[in-house]
Amino acid sequence: MWKLKIADGGSNPYIFTTNNFVGRQIWEFDPQATDPQQLAKVEAARLDFYHNRYKLKPNSDLLWRMQFLEEKAFTQTIPQVKVEDGEEVSYEAVTAALRRGVHLYSALQASDGHWPAENAGPMFFMPPMVMCLYITGHLNAIFTEEHRSETLRYIYYHQNEDGGWGFHIEGHSTMFGTVLNYICMRLLGEGPEGGQDNAVSRGRKWILDHGGATSIPSWGKTWLSIMGLCDWSGCNPMPPEFWLLPSYLPMHPGKMWCYCRMVYMPMSYLYGKRFTARITPLILQLREEIHIQPYDQIDWKKVRHVCCKEDMYYPHPLLQDLLWDTLYLTTEPLLTRWPLNKLIRKRALQTTMKHIHYEDENSRYITIGCVEKVLCMLACWVEDPNGDYFKKHLARIPDYLWIAEDGMKMQSFGSQHWDTAFSIQALLASNMAEEIGITLAKGHDFIKKSQVKDNPSGDFKGMYRHISKGAWTFSDQDHGWQVSDCTAEGLKCCLLFSMMQPEVVGESMAPESLYNSVNVLLSLQSQNGGLPAWEPAGAPEWLELLNPTEFFENIVIEHEYVECTSSAVQALVLFKKLYPLHRRKEVERFITNGAKYLEDIQMPDGSWYGNWGVCFTYGAWFALEGLSAAGKTYNNCAAVRKGVDFLLNIQLEDGGWGESYQSCPDKKYVPLEDNRSNLVQTSWALMGLIYAGQADRDPTPLHRAAQLLINSQLEDGDFPQQEITGVFQRNCMLHYAAYRNIFPLWALAEYRRQIQLHSEATKMV
């Protein structure tokens, strides 16, 4: 049986940490764990997901939950409550529902204080890892038989009815998702006609019916070229010489959004070397299986710009194609021949590897994310197959693997801090500290230990890195990458804890550490008042014309976001209250400009586009809470009034809200099919309305939403998993498995604290 291990570094000599592995979560298979009852529960969960896989794509993340609840012998003792139609939502009912959820969720806390959870969903994360291990000869050593079977399970369970695989688990079939998962199945041992429900042959049919693998998007062409399944001449140029350009030029990689930069970095190294894996009999078979014409007859030059229509989200502008054609026809032929291949290309490759090693070391070989992880690992192996750099990469592979009832997948890189910061705020809002003091103290300890204590090493500005001392990452301290909203949410938690009794929640964070966090936030605000996520924005907008991907938007440069801005405004308003003299004018100016940004980016219909959650509901929650924190109210701010009207106009008959992920790529509000409600989105909308003062005007919409949340709670205090609610780069969805607990609890807590108590006080008067 698989077991989740917490804060465990194991005995691998090639792994190192900054804080004793706090936040690390890895799965290990325990052959001795053979309890028949537990095995039966796991198998039942798998079968239930399989039979409902076309109705509900995200899993319920049950395996670790079963493990933790069993280890803690948790039993729900508080009776379930229901609020009948026409019945008033009483203080007692909401308290009972909240307490049931809080007790269950507290039992799900890990020993180091964080809340584990799956953070995955894209169908292109795992296949490159399998390809890399196959190329390097480590597939059998890293992927045991149990790893293989669970990885194949995930592929089988998320195959679409038409035989293909999507860009993400809820998406329509794409060439990118289908080709990568087809290759993955074959590398893991499935034959051309193998796989559950004829998965392999059905996948191959989809590929051939849609034009074959030559129409895979550009990232796919890169991986196929690495594998020897395409020729590098079928790829657009990715010259590593860009790293040699003067840094003041606008197209220098240092000006790129960090994720774009980190992907381009190892890709350009592999492209510059024209690295191709050893051609094995399996590779020769795959060449015959995924192309519609013989491999040696494909005109690779003609397929460079070809992309399957099912994959196309962001068509390349003509200007970009002209740039690639110029580099392809003139620059590359020169740089790959003597003497320039010795004078320039060799130096460019060395510079690129210098950056790769720097980023690897400063993230403890986790790297910034899973796409980059695999590419950097492969680049290190290409440079030195027996080197320590590659061995350090191997040691961190378990950090990315996650198992649930739908199988094993690769995570984005883990959402440990992000989920925990929200969880803490939800629990604090419940006002049940006397019941969950130990839980809060452990969570506080995790937050404090997860703060980044130093800037990146050495001349970090010369390596195009920003300050990180005092920040929080999305996952854990070892990851190292500062994120503005993660920093703001971590700072909020520490400030809230500092207002509580230390004998209950532990010692407060030192003021100097809080100041470091404030410094990070202040350093990131743009001239327009908004906040980017990772690094200061400011590169020219026209660089987005060079977006080389066909399935993402806004990936070339850093941009400002409503969520990051709101989180930072909320954190600094609370900080100013507790530390009114520290950098007072800068903090006040930040809050004023941040609030103005939130007003300025509101859509004409009163909504805000959510960049990291689905979508306008998510954006509205953040915007309204941020504006409220800055002193904006329904009476003095038109943006608040329009935002409230937007949410009220889309409330459903059952009292909830439900928004389709299609809102994200379409950039317009799209309701869920059949006007279904989603409990996470209902919670976002409810909290947004609460902070906008809806109770003072008409609390009925709030009562209806609270009734839906209470009545939807399950017998054990959990909430049902529903549609996917996370997103990145507008077109790829992300499954935040903890959201189904965090946000209904948080919304009920705020409702109880701000609406029910207010109502009770009014009655007494």
UniProtKB/Swiss-Prot annotation:
What would be an example GO MF term here? lupeol synthase activity
Which GO CC terms are listed, alphabetically? lipid droplet
- Record EC number: 5.4.99.41
Reaction(s) catalysed by this chain, per the record, are:
(S)-2,3-epoxysqualene = lupeol
Q: Which residues form the active site?
A: 485 (proton donor)
Q: Which UniProt keywords apply?
A: Isomerase, Repeat
Q: What is this protein called?
A: Lupeol synthase
